[in-house]
UniProtKB/Swiss-Prot annotation:
This is Intraflagellar transport protein 122. WD repeats lie at residues 51-89, 132-171, 634-673. The keyword Cytoplasm applies. It is found in: Cell projection, Cilium, Flagellum; Cytoplasm, Cytoskeleton, Flagellum axoneme; Cytoplasm, Cytoskeleton, Flagellum basal body.
Length: 1709
């Protein structure tokens, strides 16, 4: 640990007795003289505050930093805020030198001579509690839990007290104690279990024996006798047990130069423990006065000066005091770990204060780059700096003889009175001359790494060993200062100042393998290594290291290297080897060279070797047992670091110029063994890039030691990288180099960079590269803290993608294949390709996408590496490809390699090349299947290696097909050769070379071949498809892009493959399959062209119709010739039927003609469905079918052409007349339509058309026309009866007449309803009938009458039949031919004449003049499902009419109708009216609450919210638009609009039985309170509401009450709006204050959730009702949604067993 002064400040001439800082370290306070100086970490003095104290002796600051307390010799204790303003003060009788805040900030303790003051900071009203105290207090320390504190005095007493002033324990140290702390035991280091014998003569880590006897102190007993007495025995034991005082330790340093650790839970009763370490004293003379105190004194040690101040950082104690020395101790045992600094009076930082250096600050910063293996000078840095400063200081003072700085310096005038720690790594000392000195603590990193094992020093006395791959960790508590360490396989060596400790790893799996592979990690964990949360790895077993031996010698070295049975001590000028007994076995000395770097490279046990770099650039190997080093290479610059690849092929060298060079390591062929005088022979053509070995050369480094040559022939590296800080080789993937720069890390393969990632902190470097994980050493934490460093802070894991590495090696293999001589038929498998594929598989196993695996399999198949290809395919689970390989290799064919190559091409989507290869190997079936995967543009495949694969495939095609292709096919081959020519893609780039465009020079050849096929129609269509005419339109217009059949790459390839077919059937099968594939792939135009290419127009039409390619279909049918036909009669010809001159004619009986006819019919159906009649007529003309043409002309409305067609075909005239009649009917020309029907001669349809006319007149409400048409129908029936016998159809006519008359009656009533809606409400919407003002019965009489018409219709079927009986008899007897009006009149007269009045009243026949009676409504049975209601009639209209008609006359019918109306949940203002009527009918059947006041008004006649008077049942009034909006948002249980209070606007809630006003107030949350919070707060806290009620037992709404926070009035809305119908608006706090027993939370399922979205929970509105009288009994029924008076409801339920409103039976009272 390196310590340097950062700055100094001169704050006064008097000593700085106290230093404090805020928790965040932004402000610090120093006490000097009578001034308190405030300064920052900069440093800069921000304020100097002069106090009233003659001398400030002590400062204290609260844990939150808001209060600063100053104390002085006058005994005053002054509290100030952070700005210096005085808050309050209190006084002691004598000076105060000790004070402290409790850790939680609640208590403050100040101690003076004679008393102790305890102040409660959080209670300003509490006075200071004074306790008597004997002695001169010097320090106070609180326990971490603020439960007790310790006071040390000038007499050496330690007194433990509680905040209440009770004394728990005390002891005497025998000397003044100014430095005091209390810590928890968990912060102590755990000592190793193995006992270590310490040689005191050779070690500074001395251990002291602690006798367990003490001598009572007279001063202690005297002090305790003068204090306040308590029941100490009982209280002390209870307090110690309850507060776990055994888990704490008191750390104290006294003036007898001793450091002690004391257990506060052991009772000492003032005993003196000063001589517990005097083992040589005569104990027999004092044995009677001693008592056994087990466990009181935990540890004791000596310190080299009188301590005055103490600071704790982690597990270490920093002490300073008389003489200005600063030392660091082990907090658990007090060992002096290091002497950090010595303050000299003549030091420039002291004598020239203030001193804030600027340039030296950056000059003395430690080097951030900490690379393992660097060799430096072994002298301790702090000792060297201390000696240098001592010489400078003594030279200034002219003092020659200076004693050891670790001894007591009485001559020193500089004392350190105070000390504070400032994060992250600074100490500020307060000196006796008024100077503040800041020291910087720089923590040196001691670590070692071997493979995946990494060991580093935690703090100063612990070593952490971890496996980077698995995350397993082991922490070794050494207990001594760790100076160096080394790890190798299962051996760990730790060097301290006095010995060397050896540990062994107890892991059998690791003993078998030197390095744990990264694959071990994947088999055991899925979360990676670096986990900041250690709890995630608790279930993982840790590394188990056992102590083996201790070599008790003091070794001096800069770098320690350990092997299985030896260890290397490396220094700048020599390297020595020792066995585990400490005996030296080998030694190499360098006189002219300086060793700069050492790295272990392993070897045979007991013959391990190290790799050593020198400042001259030499790199050598030193091997145990071999006196002659081996020179590997000579570099041009001094060596900084070295590394060797795992396969021992390459060595990387990093020099001082930040350049990494990669050399080839030793080859077996270059090593000559045996003869010592053998010279190394080098051929003239030996490459200089390979390193040479100078074995047994008789030239040494200094001229004496043989083994290393001195020639200046520098070795030539394979490649270099600049700007490199470190470089290491991958442990799993040989040949992969991790190169660290200042800001990033490059993953290199050969001379290229495959992946780069940025460093989170500049200057960090790769510690270990293990496959796909890079472990980064973070240098940002170096030298900043002495607290135990955790590996999660030091090491960062970065995932390295393996895909670039796999792509590079696969690309390299493919490049090898491309450079091979394919034309000569070279054998592809080679050793180089095998090596690259194996390395690629290793990288792929660490995780790459599926595409990389497929590229690997393709490269293996193209390289003829079947075993590797099977391995890759098995890894990704490609069973299909494995089976294909097995089938291909099972065949004995000379084209096996060709088939494997075709399989590889098909796997990477190079289907065109693969299909040609399969076709060339006589596998047309497979070639056809691959043809399905080819696009028409031949787009280059999106793969980094696609370009190379295409080039390799095309070379294979050229070699295999060159001999069998001629003419046009060879030209196609040339196109394939030039298409997509590949270029080499550099490593690290993701861009693939673009393929060249397809050469179109050969299109003419294919078009000529197509023309030679002999069909002009196909040629025309292909040309039309290619041109893409823009005139075509329709729903599937395909003119967005043009399609060129001749440039379709699939068609070109299909023709090329078809040339390899041996038979015509194979060729036809290929075309059919490809055409069907194009059709299923939605390639409609390509499929249609393919079908035409094989003379199948029907299939082409099907394809275009299915795809709705209207434009292409239209172009095709215009090109087709007309259907050939044989005419049996001479008919006039039309130009549309003429065939084009250049069109081909088929024979009428030919297969082609039949196919063409079917194609035309399919196209005709398509255009007809699309309402494209112009094109449909054209197709019908080509088809030659006059009936179809007639139908289309009629649908089109071309009557002139229809008439002309009728003249040409007379047999079609009846159909033309009927069609014309239908058209006239649609136009309303009924007489002309009937005339056309008579001309058609189809009299059977005349009556049907008349009936259709009647239906149309009824639908249009033209009832006079309906009666006339009914008479016309009767005449038609009579005419039929006069000329022919009565048929069965005549009976149907009679039934039709009956139904027509019934419908006339029904729609007459319906017309009355509509007339009323239009005249009164100005609306034709039947749902608006609820807007009728029902209180005016005269205005609703017509509606009631109309409703009775509608409801009575279905119940009078028999009456209607009897009414038409006379008319039916006249028709059957044929007594006369009557008109429609005469028939109706005669029927009425005959009915009046023959039937008596009683019969007519019984029948109840309804005519337009009949007025219905209300009494008949009681006998109508509509049923639950409303099966008897006429279709199209609203059920709501019927129930409203029934409710109005039966009011006060038929209560049961009215109740039933009202229930159905409420169940329908009608919107608008009618809901309030019907709720009221329902309550009147069901609630009080014996009373009438219609409009007057109730006689029982004494129950509740006031508003429960504002106490405004209300009527028991107010009368109803007209409802306006605003009222409708208010009623829509009212709860279901608030019956009518008239019950809204006019004063406060609250809706009234009535009992559904007696209509009493219930003491319920509607409430709702405010805008800032959500419904969820309101529901939660409403059921949380109970509150007494009765105490808030007035004498009138109502809520008092006084002004004073509104200003308080108590009472229900606070929850009522303060500014209510009269008539708004809203409830009281509450906040969440007000909801919480109301008792849950007085809040009713109701689910309002009757209201529309969209009206009140803020109150909706689960699509249901939540309502809050507050009961204002807590003892009033209420009941709420969830079935009907009404509130009831509790007593009334219970009486009714007990009698009937159900709810009086909804009839629910599952009621809980």
């Amino acid at each position: 640990m390196k310590v340097e002064p950062l700055w100094s400040l001169d704050v006064g001439t008097q000593p700085v007795y106290s230093l404090v800082r805020t928790p965040d370290g932004t402000k610090m306070y120093a006490a000097t003289g009578k001034t308190v100086v405030t300064f920052g970490p900069g440093p800069e003095i921000t304020r100097q505050t002069s106090t009233q104290h003659p001398l400030v002796t002590c400062l204290a600051i609260s844990p939150d930093g808001h209060m600063v307390v100053s104390m002085g010799t006058d005994g005053a204790v002054m509290f100030n805020d952070s700005t210096g303003a005085a808050l309050f003060k209190y006084s002691h009788q004598n000076e105060v030198q000790a004070a402290a805040f409790s850790p939680d900030g609640s208590l403050f303790v100040s101690a003076a001579i004679g008393d102790v003051g305890i102040y409660h900071c959080r209670d300003v009203k509490t006075k200071v509690m004074k306790q008597s105290f004997k002695g001169t207090p010097r320090a106070i320390a609180w326990a971490p839990g603020s439960d007790w504190f310790v006071i040390s005095t000038q007499d050496g007493d330690l007194v433990i007290m509680t905040p209440e002033g009770m004394e728990l324990n005390s002891c005497n140290l025998g000397a003044p104690a100014w430095a005091l702390k209390v810590v928890q035991c968990s912060s102590f280091l755990v000592q190793p279990n193995t006992a270590l014998d310490v040689d005191i003569a050779n070690s500074s880590d001395d251990e002291f024996t602690i006798p367990q006897t003490v001598t009572p102190s007279a001063s202690a007993s005297g002090r305790s006798g003068s204090g306040k007495r308590h029941k100490v025995e009982l209280d002390r034991e209870e307090f110690i047990t309850s507060h776990n005082m055994d888990n704490f330790r008191i750390l104290v340093a006294s003036w007898d130069m001793r450091y002690r650790v004391i257990n506060p839970s052991v009772y000492a009763d003032g005993a003196c423990i000063a001589k517990m370490t005097d083992g040589g004293s005569d104990s027999r003379s004092r044995s009677s006065s001693r008592r056994r105190l087990d466990g009181l004194l935990v540890a004791v040690s000596e310190i080299p000066f009188i301590p005055l101040c103490m600071e704790i950082i982690g597990n270490y104690v920093f002490l300073s005091g008389v003489g200005g020395s600063v030392v660091v101790l082990n907090s658990s045992n007090g060992r002096v770990l290091s002497s950090l600094y010595q303050v000299w009076e003549s030091d420039p930082f002291i004598s020239k204060a203030p001193l804030i250096p600027t340039e030296s600050q950056s000059k003395h910063l430690p080097q951030k780059r900490t690379i393992m293996g660097q060799v430096t000078t072994c002298t301790d840095v702090n000792q060297r700096l201390m000696e240098l400063r001592k010489r400078e200081a003594m030279a200034n003072r002219n003092v020659k003889n200076v004693t050891n700085p670790l001894a007591f310096h009485g001559m020193h005038t500089i004392w350190c009175y105070s000390m504070i720690h400032v994060e992250p790594s600074s100490l500020i000392l307060g000196l006796s001359n008024g100077v503040l000195l800041c020291l910087s603590l720089r923590y040196a990193m001691i670590h070692s790494q071997y493979g995946s094992l990494y060991a580093y020093r935690r703090g100063l006395m612990s070593v952490s060993v971890m496996n980077l791959s698995t995350g397993r960790e082991s922490i070794l508590e050494v207990g001594m200062h760790v100076e160096n360490l080394s790890i190798y396989e299962s051996t760990l060596a730790i060097k301290t100042s006095s010995r060397l400790l050896l540990y062994r790893l107890q892991d059998p799996a690791l003993k078998k393998r030197n390095i744990e592979s990264v694959m071990d990690y994947y088999s055991s964990s899925t979360n990676g290594l670096i986990e900041t949360d250690r709890s995630r790895r608790q279930n993982m077993s840790s590394l188990s290291y056992s102590f083996e031996t201790s070599i008790k010698k003091r070794f001096v070295c800069s770098q320690l290297i350990v092997s299985n049975n030896h260890f290397f001590l490396c220094n700048v000028s020599h390297i020595s080897v020792h066995d585990f007994s400490g005996k030296q076995t080998d030694r190499w000395t360098f006189k002219q060279l300086k060793c700069t770097y050492v790295r272990s490279i392993g070897g045979i046990p007991s013959n391990e070797a190290v790799l050593v770099g020198f400042d001259t650039g030499k790199v050598c190997i030193f091997k145990i047992g071999n006196k002659f080093p081996i020179e590997l290479l000579l570099h041009r610059s001094p060596i900084v670091s070295l590394d060797i690849s795992p396969d021992r092929k390459y060595i990387s060298v990093v020099d001082r110029s930040d350049v990494v060079s990669v050399y080839k390591f030793l080859d077996d062929s270059e090593i000559v063994l045996g003869a010592t005088n053998m010279a190394v022979v080098e051929h003239e053509n030996t490459p200089t890039s390979y390193s040479r070995i100078a074995a047994l050369a008789h030239v040494s480094l200094d001229g004496n030691l043989p083994g290393i040559t001195t020639g200046q022939d520098y070795s030539v590296p394979l490649y270099t990288f600049k700007g490199t800080t470190s470089a290491i080789w991958d442990l799993v993937l040989p040949g992969v180099l991790a190169r660290s720069t200042q800001k990033s890390v490059d993953i290199c393969i050969d001379s290229g960079v495959s992946y780069t990632f940025q460093l989170s902190y500049p200057g960090s470097f790769v510690l270990c590269q293990n496959g796909n994980r890079a472990f980064i050493f973070n240098v940002s934490y170096l030298g900043q803290s002495l607290v135990n460093l955790d590996y999660s802070s030091l090491i960062e894991m970065v995932e390295v993608p393996m895909m670039p590495m796999v792509i590079y090696r696969t690309h390299k293999v493919l490049r090898m294949l491309l450079d091979s001589n394919y034309e000569a038929g070279a054998v592809f498998p080679s050793q180089a390709a095998n090596y690259e594929l194996n390395e690629a598989i290793k990288a792929a196993n660490l995780g790459v996408p599926m595409d990389c695996w497929r590229d690997l399999a393709i490269a293996a198949l193209l390289s003829n590496e079947l075993d590797l290809a099977r391995e890759v395919l098995a890894t990704i689970g490609d069973i299909r490809s494995l089976k294909a390989i097995a089938e291909i290799t099972r065949q004995t064919s000379t084209k096996t390699y060709l088939l494997l190559s075709a399989l590889a091409l098909s796997m990477c989507d190079h289907f065109s090349e693969a299909s040609l290869l399969f076709a060339a190997s006589d596998d047309i079936q497979m070639a056809t299947e691959l043809l399905f995967f080819i696009n028409r543009e031949c787009i280059p495949y999106n793969s980094p290696n696609s370009s190379l694969i295409s080039s390799i495939a095309k070379k294979l095609i050229c070699r295999e097909l060159h001999s069998s292709l001629t003419g046009t096919e060879e030209k196609i081959l040339e196109v394939l050769k030039t298409q997509g020519d590949s270029t080499y893609s550099p490593l690290g780039t993701q861009t693939a070379p673009e393929a060249k465009e397809t050469n179109t020079a050969l299109l003419t050849d294919f078009s000529d071949k197509l023309l030679a096929k002999g069909r002009a129609t196909v040629n025309k269509f292909l040309s039309a498809i290619e041109s893409g005419s823009s005139k075509a339109d329709g729903p599937g217009n395909d003119n967005k892009d043009t399609y060129n059949y001749f440039n379709d790459y699939r068609i070109l390839l299909r023709r090329q493959i078809s040339s390899f077919a041996k038979t015509e059937s194979e060729r036809a099968n290929l075309v059919v399959r490809h055409s069907k594939f194009l059709e299923t792939s939605l390639e409609w135009r390509a499929a249609a062209a393919s079908y035409l290419d094989m003379d199948d127009p029907e299939s082409a039409i099907d394809v275009l119709i299915t795809s709705k390619q209207t434009g292409a279909l239209l172009r095709l049918v215009r090109i087709f010739p007309p259907v050939a036909r044989e005419l049996n009669h001479k008919a006039p010809s039309f130009n549309d039927f003429e065939s084009p001159e250049d069109a081909d004619e088929y024979a009428p009986s030919s297969v082609q003609n039949q196919m063409l006819k079917r194609a035309y019919r399919k196209a005709l159906v398509y255009f007809e469905k699309s309402n494209d009649y112009s094109n449909a007529i054209f197709i019908a003309q080509r088809l030659g079918d006059p009936l179809v043409l007639l139908r289309l002309l009629i649908q089109q409305g071309s009557w002139s052409q229809v008439e002309a067609l009728g003249k040409a075909y007379p047999e079609m005239m009846p159909s033309i007349h009927e069609a014309k009649a239908s058209m006239l009917l649609r136009e309303g020309r009924f007489i002309e339509a009937l005339e056309r029907l008579r001309l058609s001669g189809n009299t059977s349809k005349e009556a049907i058309i008349i009936k259709q006319l009647i239906d149309a007149s009824i639908a249009e409400c033209k009832f006079n026309l309906t009666r006339a048409l009914t008479g016309q129908l009767a005449k038609q029936i009579a005419k039929t009866r006069a000329f022919a016998a009565l048929s069965v159809s005549s009976m149907e006519y009679y039934a039709a007449i009956k139904a027509i008359r019934a419908r006339v009656l029904v729609y007459t009533g319906y017309q009355q309803v509509m007339e009323y809606m239009v005249n009164i409400l100005r609306s034709r919407d039947l749902s608006d009938i609820t807007m009728i003002r029902l209180h005016d019965n005269t205005q609703s009489a017509k509606v009631v009458t109309a409703g009775i018409f509608l409801t009575s219709y279905a119940a009078m079927a028999n009456e209607l039949t009897n009414a038409d009986s006379v008319f039916s008899e006249e028709l059957e007897n044929n007594t006369g031919i009557l008109s429609g009006e005469d028939t109706v009149k005669a029927s009425s007269q005959r009915s009046k004449k023959d039937n008596p009045p009683s019969l007519r009243s019984t029948i109840g026949f309804i005519t337009s003049s009949t007025t219905p009676q209300l009494g008949s409504l009681a006998h109508i049975d509509l049923g639950i499902n409303n099966m008897n209601i006429p279709p199209g009639i609203s059920e709501l209209i019927i129930w409203v009419c029934l409710a109005l008609a039966s009011r006060r006359t038929y209560p049961e019918v009215e109740a039933r109708a009202l229930k159905r109306i409420l169940a329908s949940r009608i919107p608008g203002p009618m809901i309030g009216y019907f709720r009221r009527q329902m309550l009147l009918v069901k609630g009080t059947p014996a009373k009438d609450f219609s409009h007057g006041e109730s006689s029982d008004a004494e129950s509740r006649d006031a508003c429960p919210r504002c106490a405004a008077p209300l009527k028991a049942l107010p009368p109803s009034r007209p409802v306006g638009a605003q009222d409708m909006a208010i009623l829509s948002s009212l709860p279901h249980c608030c019956p009518v609009f008239s019950d809204i209070c006019k004063n406060c606007g609250s809706p009234i809630v009535r009992s559904a039985l007696s209509l009493k006003i219930l003491p319920l107030v509607l409430a709702e949350p405010d805008d800032e309170t959500s419904i969820a919070v309101a529901l939660e707060r409403a059921a949380a806290v109970e509150m007494d509401i009765e105490a808030l009620m007035g004498e009138t037992n109502r809520l008092e709404i006084g002004t004073d009450d509104l200003q308080t926070d108590e009472g229900v009035v606070d929850v009522l809305r303060r500014a209510s709006i009269a008539g708004d119908g809203r409830g009281a608006v509450l906040t969440s706090e007000q909801f919480e204050k109301i008792s849950p027993a007085n809040i009713f939370i109701v689910d309002d399922t009757w209201s529309n959730p969209s009206l009140l979205p803020r109150f909706v929970v689960g699509n249901v509105i939540k309502r809050f009702f507050i009961r204002t009288i807590s003892d009033f009994q209420l009941h709420y029924c969830t079935g009907c949604g009404f509130f009831f008076d509790g007593i009334e409801y219970e009486e009714y339920v007990i009698v009937t067993g159900s709810c009086p409103i909804c009839g629910a039976t599952n009621i809980v009272l």
